[in-house]
């Protein structure tokens, strides 16, 4: 009989959990805190064209590296891998806080995203190593509560810091919290023995999807650059933009071939994306996640530039989006538990999201507060209704051994779609702003308007201001069309899924017992690939995995 695992004392476990919660507070805050600070940042750096990069740089690097971090946790002690990630994240926060230019801020966001990829996976793994299994759900629930609360309060915190201190404190805030975390982990967490720690250096390298990453990361970067440059710095038919699109397509095609030829260490398992229900679910997740981020980032810009809201007030004004999602997510989980079918709720979720996105795209300078708040409720209830239920689907439509990998794949594509959607939205915003100004106020140089979001009225003559404000508002509304299109994609995805019944307790037990042996073997393989920690970290630390 195997020896019972030895766990730290309650005091040590509590201190470690507090340290993990503080770190997740910083990472979760970084996802939404900039939403209300960005307009002020664009004023200081005169960088309205970089809005998309402030979010997409963080999200893309986070997404591209999280699988590698998950793998490292199986090879090296979790304590030191986690501390490495925290250190990288803190360095990125420091770079953001002291950044003298927009480019430096984007670089800092990328560095922070690199470290954040380690923190989500590591927090769940460390809890698993330090807390007895019977008490684990409570501690894991604490991680989920932290993410949920911070997701709601992030824009408000960002607005308050921007108005009463400086937008730089959105990043400086992470530094003392990170220092406390490092001390807690160093002195309270013991070093574990990783499952793949016995492998040689060559074997560790061979087990990672380095070849796939070598094509995937440049492929997505070239796609983002093409979307960013097209129609703004260069014409869509310029050789630079065309070349980037072609090279991106080639790199991503090679990445797909690598995934098919080496499925045992694939970043995206081919057998999952060829499953009809999983493919529909991917469309649903990608659409709603990408659409949500467009509104989270551009609605505060509209509120501050057009309605003259302060950063703090705009943070309060977008609370319906955050609160509605949390409430609808809880309600959706209860409804599916009772009805036992998730597909109808995913379809209703998509329909409401499309309706809410369409309503928000109709906002204009004369729109009242009731419309602004009410339209957000429709969107947030739509997206929130399916947030938790989407993560139930893999347990129903996938083999038991594929569930963890499926959840990790969904979270991977979810974050990636948010990054791409923000870049595409930025391109639409810039091109439509230039076009609208040329039509409504041809005598106004678009460069003046593009220098910042909140000083619009300081740079434009009073007699031309109504025309310029109208052009600006129309450009944001047309940017919201990207969100509408993304939500429509989610509708196509949910409508294509079969109506599968969520098994009851007895049925689920029989399924697990019947396939238990295959599940154990497959999960061991997935854990070895770093999928286990990453999948669980998103499902538990991100209970509303749509931010």
UniProtKB/Swiss-Prot annotation:
Membrane topology: Multi-pass membrane protein
GO cellular component, one term: plasma membrane
GO molecular function: transmembrane transporter activity
Subcellular localization, as worded in the UniProt entry: Membrane
Keywords, ordered alphabetically: Membrane, Transmembrane, Transmembrane helix, Transport
Domain of life where this protein originates: Eukaryota
Xref: InterPro entries: MFS, MFS_dom, MFS_trans_sf
Basic and acidic residues bias locations: 504-514
Role of this protein: MFS-type transporter; part of the gene cluster that mediates the biosynthesis of the unguisins, gamma-aminobutyric acid (GABA)-containing fungal cyclic heptapeptides with the amino acid sequence cyclo-(D-Ala1-D-Val2-L-Phe3-D-Val4-D-Ala5-D-Trp6-GABA7) for unguisin A and cyclo-(D-Ala1-D-Val2-L-Leu3-D-Val4-D-Ala5-D-Trp6-GABA7) for unguisin B. May be involved in the secretion of unguisins.
Similarity-based family: Belongs to the major facilitator superfamily. TCR/Tet family.
Name under which the protein is recorded: MFS-type transporter ungB
Biological source species: Aspergillus violaceofuscus (strain CBS 115571)
């Amino acid at each position: 009989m195997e020896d019972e695992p030895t766990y730290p004392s309650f005091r040590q476990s509590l201190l470690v959990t507090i340290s993990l919660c503080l770190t997740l507070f910083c990472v979760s805050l970084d996802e939404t805190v900039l939403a209300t600070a960005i307009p002020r940042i664009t004023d200081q750096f005169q960088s309205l064209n970089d809005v998309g990069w402030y979010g997409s740089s963080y999200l893309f690097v986070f997404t591209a590296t999280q699988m590698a971090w998950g793998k490292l946790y199986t090879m090296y002690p979790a304590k030191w891998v986690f501390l490495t990630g925290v250190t990288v994240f803190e360095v990125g926060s420091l770079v953001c806080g002291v950044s003298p230019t927009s480019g430096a801020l984007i670089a800092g966001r990328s560095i922070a995203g690199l470290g954040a990829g380690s923190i989500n996976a590591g927090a769940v793994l460390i809890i698993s190593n330090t807390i007895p299994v019977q008490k684990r759900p409570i501690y894991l629930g604490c991680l989920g509560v932290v993410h949920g609360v911070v997701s709601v309060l992030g824009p408000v915190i960002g607005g308050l810091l921007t108005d009463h201190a400086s937008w730089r404190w959105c990043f400086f805030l992470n530094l003392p919290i990170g220092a406390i975390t490092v001390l807690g982990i160093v002195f309270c967490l013991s070093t574990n023995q990783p499952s793949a720690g016995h492998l040689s250096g060559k074997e560790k390298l061979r087990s990672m999807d380095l070849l796939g990453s070598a094509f995937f990361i440049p492929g997505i970067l070239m796609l983002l650059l093409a979307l960013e440059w097209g129609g703004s710095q260069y014409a869509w038919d310029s050789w630079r933009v065309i070349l980037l699109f072609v090279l991106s397509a080639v790199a991503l095609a090679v990445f797909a071939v690598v995934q098919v030829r080496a499925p045992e260490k694939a970043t995206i398992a081919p057998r999952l994306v060829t499953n009809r229900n999983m493919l529909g679910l991917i469309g649903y997740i990608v659409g709603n996640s990408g659409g949500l981020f467009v509104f989270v980032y551009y609605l505060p810009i509209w509120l501050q530039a057009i309605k003259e809201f302060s950063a703090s007030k705009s943070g309060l004004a977008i609370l319906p989006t955050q609160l509605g999602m949390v409430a609808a997510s809880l309600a959706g989980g209860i409804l599916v538990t009772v009805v036992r079918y998730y597909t109808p709720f995913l379809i209703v979720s998509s329909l409401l999201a499309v309706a809410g996105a369409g309503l928000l795209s109709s906002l204009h300078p004369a729109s009242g507060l009731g419309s602004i708040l009410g339209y957000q409720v429709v969107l947030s209830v739509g997206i929130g209704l399916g947030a938790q239920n989407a993560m139930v689907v893999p347990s129903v439509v996938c083999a038991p051994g594929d569930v963890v990998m499926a959840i990790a794949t969904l979270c991977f594509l979810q974050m990636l779609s948010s990054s791409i959607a923000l870049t595409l939205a930025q391109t639409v915003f810039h091109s439509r702003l230039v076009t609208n100004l040329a039509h409504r106020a041809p005598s106004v140089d678009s460069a003046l308007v593009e220098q910042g979001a909140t000083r619009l009225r300081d740079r434009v003559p009073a007699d031309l201001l109504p025309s310029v404000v109208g052009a600006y508002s129309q450009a944001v509304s047309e940017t919201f069309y990207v969100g509408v299109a993304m939500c429509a994609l989610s509708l196509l995805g949910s409508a294509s899924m079969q109506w599968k019944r969520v098994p009851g307790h007895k049925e689920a037990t029989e399924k697990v017992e019947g396939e238990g042996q295959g599940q154990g073997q497959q999960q061991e393989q997935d854990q070895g690939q770093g999928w286990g920690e990453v999948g669980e970290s998103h499902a538990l630390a991100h209970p509303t995995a749509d931010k």
